[in-house]
Amino acid sequence: MGSPVMIYKTKASSFINFMAREIFMASIKGTKAKRLEFDFNFNDIYVSLKVRISYSDNVDVFDIWGSSSDDDIQVHISIHQKDFNTQSYNIFNAELRDLLRHELEHIGQWNGIYGKAEIYGLDPSHDLDSYFTQPYEIDAFLYGLNYKRKYLKTNILTEIDTLLNRYHSADKTISTDMIKSIWIERLKIILPHTL
């Protein structure tokens, strides 16, 4: 039998692909807000995924964000119905897969697969430099972005730049060069084949 980490990563990939498909299909069907709930079991780790999909004119095309703790993942999706179309589907699916992989990394951390996660207590909107340089966040971001870059067939440095530039456009105080430098050093250890 394989190591717990390898089993977790293999099942995580299946989970992400299946859930992204289910969530995507639910997102393009209908106009009413909906809630989806799924349960998934990784050996000894039970994962509960709760998804809230809403439709709003107050977002550009779509907005996806999530959180996790212990064995729960929460995903929030807001869609601008008129602008959400076939041209945006590919990016939507890539962002969704990135988010699911990011949050699954945290589930693995919470449950001791990668060592025990720390409780951060940081609101990312208040201290982005600290948030982006926490070891557990670095790994979660890099694994999520790696999943996204594979889906979009881009390179990881492009995805890092895109993510950090998006945050920098909202908060000019973020030290994107410093964060990117730290992330690249970590990439050399956990995902060296991506560089």
Positions of the model-derived regions?
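Active-site scaffold of zinc-dependent metalloenzymes
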Residues: 56-94, 110
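Long, well-structured alpha-helical subdomains associated
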Residues: 128-133, 142-195
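Short alpha-helix carrying the canonical HExxH Zn2+-binding catalytic motif
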Residues: 92-108
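Amphipathic, interaction-prone secondary-structure segments
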Residues: 37-68
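Hydrophobic or amphipathic, alpha-helical segments that drive membrane association/targeting
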Residues: 2-14, 43, 54-58
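Glycine-rich, acidic and aromatic/proline-enriched surface loops and short helix-turn segments
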Residues: 106, 110-114, 146-147
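Zn2+-dependent metallopeptidase catalytic core
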Residues: 16-46
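Post-HEXXH active-site segment of zinc metalloproteases
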Residues: 94, 110-138
